[in-house]
Amino acid sequence: MTGVQTCALPISGTIAPLAVATEAHFDQTFDVNVKGLFFTVQKALPLFKDGGSIILNSSVSNVMGLPGFTAYAASKAAVRNFARGWTMELKDRKIRVNSMSPGAIDTPALATTTGLTAEQAEQAAAQFSSQIPMGRRGKPEEIAAAVTFLASDESSFITGVDLAVDGGMAQV
């Protein structure tokens, strides 16, 4: 990763079905995932050396229809499209832009962003796992490995892609 600068940005958003989602929920999700990302990258660009790498956090929900995830999924689809557009905008500076889309990852997020009880979160995790071809949720270190790859010289000819790290969840 010689000389590579990387900007990996956080994700946010709570889950709410269309029937009960509020304008505040929608605004918070888009303010963090779309507006916050856009202006953070804009302000960081003057600090980037030519030839750097920007890695955006999207989600497999950007290509899946998941009940309750509509606003979140739409915000992550916007993130995915930032990678496409910024790839073209930043090509003259040789800054590569990619997005990484995790699937179901074994973190506390399921319990903390959905309002589910611990027992309900475990049941949901088991249901997610049953829908993943690899039969399990991913590990945080697997996400880290994917981001490390995208930031490395080994991915020097990769830009504009959305790397799904999802155990096949959104692929089949």
Regions found by a protein language model. Give the residues of each.
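Alpha-helical segment proximal to the catalytic Tyr-Lys
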Residues: 46-47, 88-92, 156
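Residue(s) in the substrate-gating loop at a strand-loop-helix junction
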Residues: 59
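Short C-terminal tail/terminal secondary-structure segment
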Residues: 15, 64, 148, 159-172
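C-terminal helical subdomain
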Residues: 99, 121-154, 158, 165-167
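Substrate-binding pocket helix/loop in short-chain dehydrogenase/reductase
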Residues: 15-18, 22-27, 124, 128
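Short, small-residue-biased leader/transition segments that mark boundaries at the very start
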Residues: 1-9
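Active-site helix of classical SDR
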Residues: 41, 75, 83
